[in-house]
């Protein structure tokens, strides 16, 4: 079974660190609008990986993304130690958190079973 991963704001160097296997398809969105359009056309995505620095209002924009995804889609936010985010409220929304820098081990732990 093929797993689809959609990224927003994640550069190629970081994607290479994730060690994404051959059974996965990687889709990259350059803007939040492009990500929204991919989801609006009904593209089934298993995991969405978003960089917190790519969002102007992370909580609000993540809520928009949540509204466009199926219940089985995992949303992962890469955040940084100096971000001023309410991590608990993001967890309550069902957002998984992955602190930068990205590592293959951290990614694998979050995406097991996807």
Language-model features: locations:
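Conserved phosphotransfer microenvironments
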Residues: 45-69, 83-86
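His-Asp phosphorelay/catalytic-motif detector in bacterial-type signaling
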Residues: 69-76
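Conserved beta-strand segments of the P-loop GTPase G domain that flank and frequently precede/overlap
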Residues: 7-8, 48-52, 76-79
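Two-component/phosphorelay signaling modules centered on CheY-like receiver
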Residues: 10-32
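Output/docking surface of receiver
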Residues: 30, 76-114
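Short, structured coil segments at secondary-structure junctions
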Residues: 21-22, 71, 91-94
């Amino acid at each position: 079974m093929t797993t689809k991963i959609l990224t927003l704001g994640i550069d190629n160097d970081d994607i290479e660190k994730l060690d994404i296997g051959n059974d996965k398809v990687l889709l990259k969105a350059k803007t939040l609008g492009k990500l929204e359009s991919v989801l609006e056309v009904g593209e089934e995505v298993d995991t969405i990986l978003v960089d917190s620095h790519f969002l102007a209002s992370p909580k609000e924009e993540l809520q928009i993304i949540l509204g466009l995804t199926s219940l089985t889609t995992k949303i992962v936010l890469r955040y940084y130690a100096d971000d001023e985010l309410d991590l608990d409220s993001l967890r309550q929304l069902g957002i998984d958190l992955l602190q930068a820098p990205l590592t293959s081990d951290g990614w694998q732990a979050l995406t097991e079973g996807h």
